[in-house]
From Swiss-Prot:
Subcellular localization, as worded in the UniProt entry: Cytoplasm
A Pfam family per the record: UDG
Protein name: Uracil-DNA glycosylase
Organism: Pseudomonas putida (strain ATCC 700007 / DSM 6899 / JCM 31910 / BCRC 17059 / LMG 24140 / F1)
EC number annotated for this UniProt entry: 3.2.2.27
UniProt xrefs under SUPFAM superfamilies: Uracil-DNA glycosylase-like
Gene name per UniProt: ung
Record carries keyword Hydrolase: yes
Active site: D70
Lineage: Bacteria, Pseudomonadati, Pseudomonadota, Gammaproteobacteria, Pseudomonadales
Length: 230
């Protein structure tokens, strides 16, 4: 049995990514993670949620891709969806700014929580390009192999899905534009919603209304960006 037969992954993604789990980089990543766990380090998100973005948004249902960098590194925050936090956790500053732009753009009231699962279930792939992190140690799992895996995910979406909107916020996300076929998809770029940069172009970008206009023009249902109460 190959390694990818043991990975608990939504079937359409498992088929599309078949073979990735047997690549040398993935063996190296797996050994790195085993070593971190064996050393008693606390790794986020919890193991069953590492692939939550893929398991929540099957490949054939992807309408929008939002790219993050690595998971939140505070206790109880990360659950495998970029920018999102688990119920009961304070909304992080970048997500507060995303909500401010949603309110400005679409007049959507600012939610009382930061749990974006409903976006994922509507076809918004909330993908961190590094999928794990050590507690209180930002970017600790960068350049360990995850980026090769998530680059392949972006390529698969570009190749196999029609009419996807890619929202690339900040330089790191924009570095992935080369993986996307701009003749098939809509690529929208702005600065990152971080408090350090949000008011230099993220607030006012109109990405949410532009996303829905693009989807509706192609006969696809818009995203309901309003989050249900918890």
């Amino acid at each position: 049995m190959t390694d990818d037969d043991r990975i608990k992954l939504e079937p359409s993604w498992k088929a599309a990514l078949r073979g990735e789990f047997d690549q040398p980089y993935m063996h190296q990543l797996r050994e790195f993670l085993r070593g971190e766990y064996a050393a008693g380090k606390e790794i986020y998100p919890p193991g069953p949620l590492i692939f939550n973005a893929l398991n929540s948004t099957p490949l054939g249902q992807v309408k929008v891709v939002i790219l993050g960098q690595d998971p939140y590194h505070g206790p109880g925050q990360a659950h495998g969806l970029c920018f999102s936090v688990q119920p009961g956790v304070a909304t992080p500053p970048s997500l507060v700014n995303i909500y401010k732009e949603l309110q400005r753009d679409l007049n959507i009231p600012i939610p009382s929580h930061g749990y974006l699962q409903s976006w994922a279930e509507q076809g918004v792939l909330l993908l961190n390009t590094t999928m794990t992190v050590e507690r209180a140690n930002a970017a600790s799992h960068a350049k360990k192999g995850w980026e090769l895996f998530t680059d392949r995910i972006i390529q698969v979406v570009s190749e196999q899905c029609p009419n996807v909107v890619f929202l690339l916020w900040g330089a790191h996300a924009q570095s992935k534009q080369k993986l996307i076929d701009g003749t098939k998809h809509l690529v929208l770029k702005s600065v990152h919603p971080s408090p350090l940069s949000a008011y230099r172009g993220f607030i006012g970008c109109g990405h949410f209304s532009r996303t829905n206009s693009f989807l509706e023009q192609r006969g696809l249902g818009p995203i309901d960006w309003a989050l249900p109460p918890l």
